[in-house]
Each structure stands twice: as structure tokens, then as C-alpha cells.
Amino acid sequence: MSGRAGLRVGLGLLAGGQVVLGLWIVLLPELFWKWPWVSHLPPYNEHLLQDFGGASLALAVVLCAAVATMERRLVLTALVACLVSSVTHLLFHARHLEPLSAASAAGFMALLGAAVLLPAVLVWLAADGTALREPGSAGTGGRPG
């Protein structure tokens, strides 16, 4: 798999994850709240959940645009936005693991760690523009000659 294809697949995975998460929260906020990794946190607040779901869907739009265009600045912007969201999410949950069993906390941190690692690796892959070039477009950084 080429760097460009790998980058596109990774962006697609991130976008798909945000779509699923966002739709779940927007359409079924109480069901999302009942998830064991969420329900032990501060009291249920539908407004905040709807905002979080909407923000997840908004991030999905930017990630989908990056997948569609593979334009360097948009790809990097989308990935950095995803990374900021993932890092802050991980840091919050890392401070609130007490109610979880050791196995559940370890699984949760592994999942959140992967949500940080994937966009970080993709930023590294996209940073110099090589992976964004169309096959046969040497030196254009993915932009038309």
C-alpha cells in the first residue's frame, strides 16, 4: 500500500469513527450515557452530550473533506484537530479511572491511546507531503503541477 493510500485509509477510519460516535450521541444520548466508560462520570447532561455529538460530526466533515481532496493543508489541519480532540479526551479520562476495574481501565486507556496514536502517525506521514502526491506527480505535494 502506498503512503497516499495508507493516509487515505487512516483518514477514512478516523472520519468513520467520528460519524459513528457523533450519530450515536446525537440520536441516542441516553444509551451513550449508559455505556460503562461514560456513566461513572459527572451527572447526565443532554445538552453537553448533544454538543459533543455535534462536534464529533463536525470533525467528521473536516476529515471527510481531507479524504476527498487529499490536499496537504486540509489533511494536516484535520489530523491536528483530531489529535487535539483525542489528547484532551485521553487526559480527561486518565484522571477519572477510579470507578473502573483494572481490566476495564486498561482497555479504555488502550482504546483512547490508539485514538491518539493513529492521527499522530498520520501527521508524521503527511508532514512532508510525500504521501500526498498523486502517483507520477513528483515534487508537487499532491497539488496539480
Predicted regions and their residues:
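Cytosolic juxtamembrane helix and N-cap/initiation of the first transmembrane helix
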Residues: 1-18
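Hydrophobic transmembrane helix segments
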Residues: 16-48, 53
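Core segments of alpha-helical transmembrane spans in multipass integral membrane proteins
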Residues: 44-67, 84
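Individual transmembrane alpha-helices with interfacial aromatic-anchor signatures
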Residues: 52-54, 103-117
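Hydrophobic alpha-helical membrane segments
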Residues: 78-93, 113-117
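Membrane-helix boundary connector in multi-pass membrane proteins
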Residues: 91-107
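Membrane-water interface at the C-terminal end of transmembrane alpha helices
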Residues: 114-136
